[in-house]
Amino acid sequence: KGHPFEYREFDKEGRVTIRDYSKQTIENFNKLKLDCLFVLGGDGTLQLAHQFFELGLPVIGIPKTIDNDLVGTDYTFGYQTAVQVACDALDRLHTTGESHQRVMILEVMGRDAGWIALEAGLAGRAHIILIPEIPYQLEKVLEKIHLRKEGGSPFSIIVVAEGAKEIGKDAITSEL
């Protein structure tokens, strides 16, 4: 695994040298008499494929993202699996949250799109769902938790997409 345009090599002292192996990659492609490079991947992989395309390599890019945020598609590769895994986790969190009377939080993928959080949260009976597309007010989240407790439900399940953010603030992941 590596980036052929910026491949990192380490010497015995731990120093890093960055080398460009793109020409060698194209030479090997031609030596093997290949017709086309099929690339299945996300943003980074397809950007890399585009660099090869710009150098004259015939490329077909097939987008893959579990975020389900590609225009013109109903579902993307990996999305339904991600939702199923999140639903399985929510089933387990329900049991623990209810028996121990706790607030349980499940963070799922979704830097810019909250589809996984939304679908898994609805299917998995989450009480609160936070997504990047709709900034939230922390006070409202706390209010919902307290209302549930006052109403006889001493536990809450929250699903948070990784890109969810409070109104007027950056996403939590931007601080890391």
Feature locations, PLM:
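N-terminal entry module detector
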Residues: 19, 46-47, 61-63
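Acidic/polar active-site rim loop that often engages polyanionic ligands
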Residues: 62-75, 98-99, 123-124
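Accessory alpha-helical/coil subdomains and C-terminal extensions
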Residues: 28-30, 39-41, 47-51, 58, ...
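Short, small-residue-rich loop/turn micro-motifs
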Residues: 3, 56, 64-66
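Glycine-rich oxoanion-binding loops at beta->alpha junctions
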Residues: 1-37, 77-89
